[in-house]
Structure formats: structure tokens, C-alpha cells
Design a protein with these regions (language model features):
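N-terminal secretory signal peptides
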Residues: 1-12, 24-26
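Short, solvent-exposed amphipathic alpha-helices that sit
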Residues: 63-80, 158-162, 185-205, 218, ...
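Flexible loop/hinge segments that line or gate small-molecule binding clefts
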Residues: 118-157, 168-170, 269-277, 281-282, ...
Length: 349
């Protein structure tokens, strides 16, 4: 039975206010924290040095380098700390265990990539019952999960635009879509959107979805094997960074662009960008991972700092097609915002 403090259903702002207020009182945190915690900066008054925990599905994946720089920059700016945890290979059990450790350790906020439709629902509800704000980032479980907000790309809409671009590039024939981990919510919605867009186009494009795995070498091997079995294919596209790099490598190795094969994918791995500049890939899609690190810290901080008056809000980090026409700045700029440098520098160059 739902009571006034039951957070298992959709969370409204009043519940968040009550939850954060009760937690602060229980922990003995005064409304105006003493200066022994985090110093004030700019508009901020001194406040506790809150600890926010990120639960990630690919902790060592280079895609998340700029995301972690975003986390670090936000923590420095707002006087907070963070912990990076989860799984290296999208193991949902490992991720749930990491989330439970964060709850047991009374983290001040949790950001989790919700790659499974149900596995994170109960720990999310438990965290909220304890007054720990939870946001999802990079991947979202949708309405079945009571997280406060999602920060990341609208993955299905991204897939629709991805599919529309494939339809522009390929007239007919066999197209292969490569995905590291079918069914997981950080990438499966892109495949779903692409399939719908291709179907709605009415073109005689035959699509086959191929699972590639979570290791870069494994992904390339499976993409190579697919090409060897289907040398008359007309397109090779991928919905994750590792598979996109694998597509780029195979297209380059066999000089497939000269045979009319079109190719593209997601994310900004260096070999992917170089392959675009060299004409082997048609495009890749930037989803701004720096923001997927910075903004969860910003939103969790404000939820704490305002006692819940400013609640986390859904934020779409966007979709930007990177092509041969606009790839140069990605290759020549060294910046934390794209993960190509550790150094803070302005102007960016």
C-alpha cells in the first residue's frame, strides 16, 4: 500500500523535498552547512562535500573518457566528489551490485546507465526511499524505472535519423547493422529506430542485425567474418563506438568504398574520425559524452543544494552528424570536451 513516503511510483517534487529534508535531518546536516565542508565558490555558500556515485556499463571504454572529464570538471566547480563503478563488460549483475554498494554506503546521489528494463527498478526505488536522488545517463529504462531524470541522447529518435541517413545512402540491397550487445538499452533503441525508418522508406533494403560483442578485437573479427560471407553487401553500419571502429577498419582494409559500399555509425573514436577524413566512412554521430558526465553532477548537486526545490530534469544531449565536411575540428582540436586532452585550455584549439 502506498503511503506518503512510498517512492516506488512516479516521484513528484513534493516527495523529493520531503525525502531530501528527512535525510538531511537524519544525518544531522544543518540547513546552512559549516565552512569545514566544501568552500563556497561564486554564488555558492559553503556546503557538505557530497559524494556522487556513477554506475557504468563499460567502465574502461574510451567513449567515457570525456564523460569522466565532465564529471571531474563539475565536481571541481561545485565542490563535490565522485566514484566511478560498475562493469567493464555490460554485466547487469555487477552493475546492480555496485548500485547496492552505493546505497549501503549512503552515497549522496547516484547516476546509473540503465541498460536493462527491470534490473535497476528495485535498487532505484530503494535509493529514493532512503532520500538518495537517482538519475540515469547514457541509457534509460523508461517509465518502468522511477529515476528522477535521464541525461543522454534520445536513443530511438537517434535511430530514426540514423536509419533515414542509411536510406539516403543506400538504394537497395543487403545492409548489415552491427550492435555490441543486443537488447541493452544504451544501443538497442537505435537499432529499433533504424529498422523502422528503413521499413517506412519502402526501399528494397534487406537488413540483417549482427551482434559483435563487447571487446574491440572481438567486434572487428565478427564484422570481418560478416563481410567475408556477404561480399555483395551494399552497406555496413553500427550503433556503438567499438563496432563503428570495426566497420571503419574492415572498409579500409578491403577498400570497399571504391566498390560502392556505404558505411557509418556512432561516437568519436580516433580511428573512426580518421576513416571519415580519409573517405572510408560516410558519417558518425556525436552524442556529446562530456555532457553525460557534467550534467548528472550538476543536477544531483542542485537537488542536494536546494533541498529538492530544483529537481533533476530530463536532458537530451543531442545528435550531431560528423562527416568529411566537418570532421577536421574533431581531428585537430585537443580538448577535454572530446577526451583528446587532459589539459584545461581556453580558447579551445
Amino acid at each position: 500500500m502506498n503511503g506518503p513516503d512510498d517512492l516506488s511510483g512516479p516521484l513528484d517534487r513534493a516527495q523529493l523535498l520531503r525525502s531530501l529534508g528527512v535525510t538531511a535531518a537524519a544525518l544531522g546536516i544543518p540547513a546552512s552547512a559549516d565552512a569545514g565542508a566544501a568552500p563556497g565558490s561564486g554564488f555558492l555558500e559553503p556546503h557538505p562535500r557530497w559524494r556522487f556515485v556513477f554506475v557504468n556499463h563499460a567502465t574502461t571504454n574510451p567513449f567515457f573518457v570525456p564523460a569522466r572529464y565532465g564529471i571531474q570538471d563539475a565536481c571541481k566547480h561545485y565542490g563535490t566528489t565522485y566514484q566511478w563503478s560498475g562493469s567493464r563488460r555490460s554485466d547487469v549483475g555487477e552493475m546492480v551490485a555496485a548500485m547496492r554498494r552505493a546505497i549501503d554506503g549512503r552515497a549522496d546521489g547516484i547516476a546509473v546507465s540503465v541498460i536493462d528494463r527491470t534490473a535497476f527498478n528495485e535498487p532505484t526505488a530503494e535509493a529514493l526511499r532512503l532520500g538518495i536522488p537517482v538519475v540515469s545517463y547514457n541509457a534509460d529504462g523508461g517509465l518502468g524505472n522511477t529515476r528522477l531524470a535521464y541525461v543522454g541522447q534520445d536513443l530511438y529518435q537517434s535511430g530514426l535519423k540514423f536509419g533515414a541517413r542509411i536510406v539516403e545512402l543506400v538504394r537497395d540491397g543487403d545492409v548489415f547493422l552491427f550492435i555490441a550487445t543486443p537488447g541493452q538499452l544504451n544501443i538497442q533503441p537505435r537499432v529499433d529506430g533504424a529498422l523502422d525508418a528503413i521499413k517506412d522508406s519502402g526501399k528494397a533494403i534487406r537488413v540483417t542485425v549482427v551482434a559483435t560483442g563487447t571487446g574491440v578485437a572481438e567486434e572487428r573479427t565478427r564484422i570481418e567474418a560478416t563481410y567475408q560471407r556477404h561480399k555483395n553487401l551494399r552497406g555496413m553500419f553500427a550503433v556503438d563506438g567499438g563496432s563503428t571502429q570495426g566497420v571503419a577498419d574492415v572498409v579500409r582494409k578491403h577498400r570497399l568504398r571504391g566498390r560502392g559500399v556505404r558505411a557509418g555509425g556512432y561516437d568519436l573514436l580516433p580511428r573512426t574520425l580518421r576513416s571519415i577524413a580519409d573517405g572510408h566512412l560516410d558519417f558518425t554521430i556525436d552524442q556529446q559524452p562530456y555532457l553525460q558526465g557534467f550534467l548528472p553532477i550538476f543536477q544531483l548537486f542542485l537537488a542536494r543544494y536546494t533541498g529538492g526545490l530544483v529537481a533533476p530534469a530530463d536532458t537530451n544531449t543531442g545528435l550531431h552528424f560528423v562527416t568529411r565536411r566537418n570532421v577536421r575540428p574533431y581531428l585537430t582540436t585537443r580538448t577535454r570536451y572530446e577526451g583528446s586532452s587532459r589539459i584545461h585550455k581556453y580558447p579551445v584549439s
